[in-house]
């Protein structure tokens, strides 16, 4: 075996030489209690003074500064919210005005277009009425001319038929009155 390891004889001898007892842990020694309490009191007083005079004011200042910053930010946010609400109201009012103007412009344009369309329709109707009247005059003149030609042709045809069938020359007045009676109806 290795030296120092597992040597039970050496361990027993060492314990037996000390008598089996060692000195107590220093904080538990009765002789040093008073000096330890004084040292502990001085340390806690020093720690209290450092914390209360240096650290707490700094931390308090930081907390106070942070609180002021938060309050300032909240006030600025409230102000900006009010401004944005006002801007939104102004935008909505402008939008409503724009809508009403657009509707008015649309109505005005619609009225103008309707009036223009009505005027154009009336002009077109007048032109068509004039064209129809001209066409009726032309038709009437053409009919009169055609009827005049038909009378002449009918009179000649009737005279030719009578001469062919009867072998006589018919009277022109009698022939014209018979053709006129036949044409009238």
UniProtKB/Swiss-Prot annotation:
Say yes or no: keyword Transport present. Answer: yes
Give the chief site where it resides: membrane
Molecular function as annotated in GO: proton-transporting ATP synthase activity, rotational mechanism; proton-transporting ATPase activity, rotational mechanism
CDD domains documented for this protein: ATP-synt_Fo_b (cd06503)
Q: Where in the cell is it found?
A: Cell inner membrane
A single GO CC term, please? plasma membrane
Matching InterPro entries, A to Z? ATP_synth_b/b'su_bac/chlpt (IPR002146), ATP_synthase_B_chain (IPR050059)
Describe its membrane topology.
Answer: Single-pass membrane protein
**Keyword terms, alphabetized:** ATP synthesis, Cell inner membrane, Cell membrane, CF(0), Hydrogen ion transport, Ion transport, Membrane, Transmembrane, Transmembrane helix, Transport
Function in brief: F(1)F(0) ATP synthase produces ATP from ADP in the presence of a proton or sodium gradient. F-type ATPases consist of two structural domains, F(1) containing the extramembraneous catalytic core and F(0) containing the membrane proton channel, linked together by a central stalk and a peripheral stalk. During catalysis, ATP synthesis in the catalytic domain of F(1) is coupled via a rotary mechanism of the central stalk subunits to proton translocation.
- Its name, as the record gives it, is ATP synthase subunit b 2
